[in-house]
Amino acid sequence: MEEMPCSRVVLLVQLMIISLIINSAASESYSSMIRSHRKAAYAAFFVALLWYNLEDIQQPLPLIFTIFFPAAMQKEIHMTRPVRNYKWKDGKMLSLGDVSLVMGILNVTPDSFSDGGLWNTKEHAMSHMKDMAADGAALIDVGAESTRPGHTELTAEEETARLMQLLPLLLDASSVPISIDSYHYETMEKALSAGAHMVNDVWGFQYDDGSMAAVTAAYGVPAILMHNQNDTVYEGDIISSMKSFFDRTLSIALAAGVKEERIILDPGIGFGKTGEQNMEVLARLEELTQAYPYPWLLGV
């Protein structure tokens, strides 16, 4: 008999754990089940990681596994810091710090690893954005350049042209705030001038000479600042290295005039980290959230 790969055994075990938890809560309402059994979220996250790393599994990850994780993070991160309330001129609002929220991802790209080419037409992008908002997304993140491994890097001009074909329509139709996923300050300035609500910089203000931070400060919008690096080599402890990165990021942000209450941090799961390093960061996430009392975004 052929030996079953270890990763598949772990996958089956995690599926069994989730099944037992769901069965034990069969008498409860669905929302109560999620609140009462947050441990299922961690098993669900392991399932997601394994699912995408097993080449012989062709079916997409079932949606149920994306539901548990945000509920768990509300407990794990201990969201006791003051609530951040954001309100924009167009009437849109966002409250961070009280409960965990879900960000919807809209990639208007032809080559993103998860959904490249699915939403890069006006009709499909509008439909998907509205569906995510209806399903409970508190904000929508729009990206015009893929950041998957091996992606083709765009110039700021190319990214801006692709984004601005759709952004005005999305802003006009959206019922929730829209953030822009870009590390090009030129693209971000165009998007913010068109009415975008938030910055999402996957290089944490460290891609350029401070221009992205200056643009963010000029428009007075919230900014999601992510940890990233070009390789997976860390000298010493990974959390210590990430803290050094965030120290630089915060120094750049505050020096440029970005208000502290508008800063959101992201540990960059899947960026500049191996699978094992990702799991270590998740296991030690509270070390970061305690060191930096800001709202935190997790990409899962």
Which residue ranges define each predicted feature?
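Active-site-adjacent beta->alpha loops and helix N-cap segments on the catalytic face
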Residues: 152-164, 186, 206-219, 279
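Conserved anion-binding
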Residues: 147, 206-274
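Alpha-helix-loop-beta-strand connector modules within alpha/beta enzyme cores
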Residues: 153-179, 218-222, 285-296
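Active-site mouth loops of central-metabolism enzymes
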Residues: 110-125, 235-239
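N-terminal amphipathic alpha-helix/helix-capping segment at the start of soluble metabolic enzymes
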Residues: 76-107
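Alpha/beta enzyme core
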Residues: 124-142, 193-194, 250
